[in-house]
């Protein structure tokens, strides 16, 4: 039988990245946290944490963390229901937090609008980890989140992968810059395009390379780049003429400050909702809301 206090200490150390911050969060002494972690590791017969500047979970620790979070969520559902029943449904349910990993474009364009009614109705809090869609599954694997919007189609261990649809991206630039990328006949010149900077969300963002590979046959092309890791600022940089970039087509509706560099040329990113196979009632509601929102806003695949 796992000790609840040891699990609490373990979860806090991973969440806060160290023994000291975990001790402060739990209002315990540092030695007390260390003793609980050592007892947990000794009891299970393996290391659960990698000690370093920022403490992180081992593979075994990641599996244990996912278990701990699943149990915590299910307990929160049960306690919330019991309290509501004891109060005769007279009082509001306690707020419950759900951790998810999502790419920034999805958060801005369809995820939040789609799940907002659910969050308000069931008093759910979101703890969102923003990462590139090709990397969000790392947070699920580590046990940090209960679900993620990902490009990974194969279900991870202990998880379910459900298709959501595709986000369609278009290569755009400010009208003046788009014109500079074309020849006198109006044809796009890839050499002219690559002479201008691309606006890229962060160093994990590979959409620009995907566009160049898909439509020009270029592999690992060299071109200047701006890195702008914020959605509003990213789009503003393109609209201001700082460079060209890939923007979801939903974000282009009604805009006149950006136009397609190569009209009709798109990149589709197929997305999946990866989540724990063993879900609490609240997590199940979120899964259904995510799927419904995706069906409304994403392209079918």
What are these regions (language model features)?
Residues 43-44, 64-91, 98:
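Alpha-helical linker/hinge and terminal dimerization helices associated
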């Amino acid at each position: 039988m796992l000790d609840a206090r040891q699990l609490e200490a373990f979860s806090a150390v991973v969440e806060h990245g160290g023994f000291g911050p975990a001790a402060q969060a739990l209002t315990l002494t540092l030695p007390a946290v260390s003793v609980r972690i050592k007892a947990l590791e000794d009891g299970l017969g393996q290391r659960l944490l990698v000690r370093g500047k920022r403490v992180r979970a081992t593979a075994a620790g990641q599996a244990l963390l996912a278990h701990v979070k699943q149990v915590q969520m299910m307990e929160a559902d049960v306690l919330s229901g019991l309290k509501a029943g004891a109060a005769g449904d007279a009082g509001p349910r306690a707020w419950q937090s759900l951790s998810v990993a999502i790419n920034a474009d999805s958060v801005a364009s369809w995820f939040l609008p789609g799940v907002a009614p659910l969050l308000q109705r069931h008093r759910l809090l979101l703890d969102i980890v923003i990462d590139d869609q090709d990397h969000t599954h790392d947070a699920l694997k580590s046990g940090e989140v209960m679900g993620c919007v990902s490009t990974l189609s194969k279900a991870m261990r202990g998880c379910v992968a459900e298709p959501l649809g595709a986000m369609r991206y278009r290569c755009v630039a400010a009208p003046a810059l788009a014109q500079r990328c074309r020849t006198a006949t109006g044809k796009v010149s890839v050499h002219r395009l690559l002479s201008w900077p691309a606006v890229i969300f962060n160093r994990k963002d590979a959409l620009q390379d995907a566009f160049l590979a898909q439509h020009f046959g270029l592999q690992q092309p060299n071109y200047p780049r701006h890195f702008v890791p914020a959605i509003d600022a990213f789009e503003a940089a393109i609209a201001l003429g700082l460079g060209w970039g890939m923007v979801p087509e939903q974000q282009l509706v009604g805009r006149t400050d950006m136009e397609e560099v190569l009209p009709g040329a798109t990149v589709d990113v197929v997305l999946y909702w990866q989540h724990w196979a063993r879900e609490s009632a609240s997590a199940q509601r979120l899964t259904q809301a995510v799927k419904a929102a995706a069906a409304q806003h994403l392209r079918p695949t």
